[in-house]
Amino acid sequence: KAMAFDGLIPALQSGQIDLIASGMDATPERREHVNFTQTYFKDGYTIVVRKDNDTIHSFDDLKDITVGAQMGTKAADYAKQYGAVVKEFNQNDQCWMELESHTCDAVVVNRVVALYFLNQGGNKAFKTVGEPILSAGVSMATTKENSELTAKVDKALDELKADGTYATLYKKWFGTEPTD
């Protein structure tokens, strides 16, 4: 079921969905409200700019720069922490369109979202810059009461990692080997 990122935890808690599988960081704040599965990949946040950009090289360069980010994400929080003027959107696709149309100067996004977009035929006029900010690790989320589903997902993840399926899929979609 497609929905805005900032609506995922409320949708889970109200019973509209059973599981969040949406690149969510297992932060301490979120752990207060949901159960998380084991981390299924390590991620971080990166900056995407147009290839002709020669002024933004790191998060420190975002001060007073117009940055696109998905609403309700840690990416938006980090952009704000570095002093960016943040335009928040419901979907990352909107961020890419804003960057392409020059209505924002950069996009802050999950590293794997950027890798997927650029590796799978996204805009060839974009590039990533700087070192990513590492995240707490990406997990799926269930309600606090649904530890049975959490355990089933953990078991499935263990099996996918053990038989090599996880590594194969990760390389296919992100163009690189998974990190621990």
Residue locations for each model-derived region?
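Ligand-binding clefts/hinges and TM-proximal coupling segments of bilobed small-molecule sensing domains
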Residues: 74-87, 126-129, 152-180
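Flexible hinge/capping segments at coil-to-helix
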Residues: 50-66
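Periplasmic-binding protein-like
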Residues: 42-49, 111, 115-158, 176-180
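A ligand-binding cleft/hinge motif common to bilobed small-molecule-binding domains
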Residues: 23-32, 78, 96-100, 105-135
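Short helix-initiation/N-cap motifs at beta->coil->alpha
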Residues: 1-10, 54, 71-73, 87-101, ...
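Hydrophobic residues within well-ordered alpha-helices
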Residues: 12-13, 62, 99-100, 140, ...
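Extracytoplasmic small-molecule ligand-binding "clamshell" domains
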Residues: 1-23, 163
